[in-house]
Amino acid sequence: MVSEKNTPVAVVMGSDSDLDVMRGCIEQLESFGIKPIVRIISAHRTPKIAAEFAQNAAENGIQVIIAAAGMAAHLAGALAAQTSLPIIGVPLTSSAGLGGVDALLSTVQMPPGVPVATMAVGKAGAKNAAIFAVQILALADENLRKKLADFKKAQEKKVIEKDSGVL
C-alpha cells in the first residue's frame, strides 16, 4: 500500500471483491505517472474508518478520491459527506445485486450539497474515473495536461488505424 501522504489520488473500494474491476482504474492512473493510495474501506462495516479517511485526506496530500462499491453503494456518498475534496463514484455489479443498477442509483442520487461525480457501472467507469481524476489534477499541473493531450491523441490514432483496416 502506498503511504497516505503526498500522492494526489486515492482509490477506495468497499470490498476486496471490487479490486478486479478497479485494477483498470489503478493501472490507468499509473499510466499517467500517478501511484494512488489503494484502500478497502466499507461505508457499512467500517464507517468510522471511512469518516476518518475522508476527514484526513486533504491534509495527507490527497486531492481526488475515487470510491467504488456495489449493491447499496454508499461509500462515495459517505466519503463526500466528510470532505470537500472531489469524490468520483464508480458503481459496481455484484453477484447479489441487480446488474449494477442498485449501485448506480445509490451513487448518483445524492442530496444537494453533497456531490459525487458518478461514472458508468463497471470497468469502463473505473477507467473513466482515473481519466476524470487526471483531468481535475491537470487544471493545476502542466505536465499532466501534456500527458492527457498525448493520451487523447493516442486514442484518436487507434480509432483512425482501426478505421483504415475495415473492409
Predicted feature locations:
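Glycine/charged-rich beta-loop-alpha catalytic/anionic-binding loops adjacent to active sites
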Residues: T7-P8, I34-V38, L85, Q109-M119
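Glycine-rich phosphate-binding loop
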Residues: F53-L92
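Short, glycine-/small-residue-rich phosphate/pyrophosphate-handling segment
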Residues: A96-K146
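N-terminal beta-loop-helix "entrance" segment that forms/cooperates
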Residues: V38-E59
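Glycine-rich phosphate/diphosphate-binding loop of Rossmann-like nucleotide-binding domains
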Residues: E4-R45
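Short glycine/serine/threonine-rich phosphate/pyrophosphate-binding segments
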Residues: D18-R23, T46-A50, M71-A78, G97-V101, ...
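Glycine-rich phosphate/pyrophosphate-binding loop and the adjoining helix
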Residues: A129, L137-L167
